[in-house]
Amino acid sequence: YENRRKYLDDSPISVVAVLNNADMREEHDIAVERYEQRADELNIDIDVRENITSADLARVFESRNDLVHFIGHSDEQGLECADGFLSIESVSESNTQTFFLNACGSYHEGVGLVRKGSVAGGVTFEAVTDSQAAEVGTTFARLMVLGYSLERALDKARQQVMTPKDYAVVGDGTHVLTQSDAGIPPTHRLVDDGDGYTLKVDQLAPWNKGGEAGEQFDHQEHEYHLNAQHRSYNFSRAELLNAIDIFENPVVYDGTLHWPDELANLL
């Protein structure tokens, strides 16, 4: 929590995507695409690095960055690099605000970054398959730029795989990197009632208790409400499809996280 004070300026958001495993290029390319989607709107600077050395990776963490998304491998020696491994113990200090170490067993390296100055980050406990890592990594990237906190972004992202407990947040999981258009990004849960649908909305956030959040279900202006759990809205199928057409955020339907375009094809 104390590390937040290091990152209170209003400079452009700097994102560094590091690919140190060529087999995971698909995750890397999609993640970069997700960060680029709101780059102009949010003033995000994106730096792409590939197959870098341990010294170069150390400089990435020591430099002022808002998010480092590392894609590769790790073991007890540290994060794998082109010339060996980087142990975070050898990093003088971390000036990287947040991070996602999408590498097998990256927990200890993540804890090390928080101890050396980062606010929070996503890590893994055990070995994860490349396909699982890609699914979690790309979903995490998309949620972060939509304004979700690290904990909520990783929680939703790991719901996409069979072994969600392999992922966790170290540091302050309530930390937010970008601002949502709705003030607080909503959690949408959709229930099929047979003759229609019920959409349940949760927009609580620990930093905005007693505040307001916006919702938009058609092409009109946002409606603003005091933060509260379990607001419910009833829709016909046609009304729901119209609402989904302008959604940016995912919807949990039948126990699975769906993006709006995917959900529209299921209804």
Language-model features: where?
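A broadly conserved detector of short glycine/acidic/proline-rich loop/turn motifs that flank catalytic sites
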Residues: 21, 74, 105, 127, ...
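A domain-level signal for caspase-like cysteine endopeptidase catalytic cores
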Residues: 1-67
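A generic structural motif
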Residues: 44-52, 124-129, 154-155
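Catalytic cores of nucleophile-dependent amide-cleaving enzymes
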Residues: 70-150
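Caspase-like cysteine protease fold
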Residues: 85, 148-267
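Short intrinsically disordered, low-complexity coil segments enriched in acidic
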Residues: 1-6, 90, 180-181
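Detector for Asparagine
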Residues: 3, 20-21, 43, 51, ...
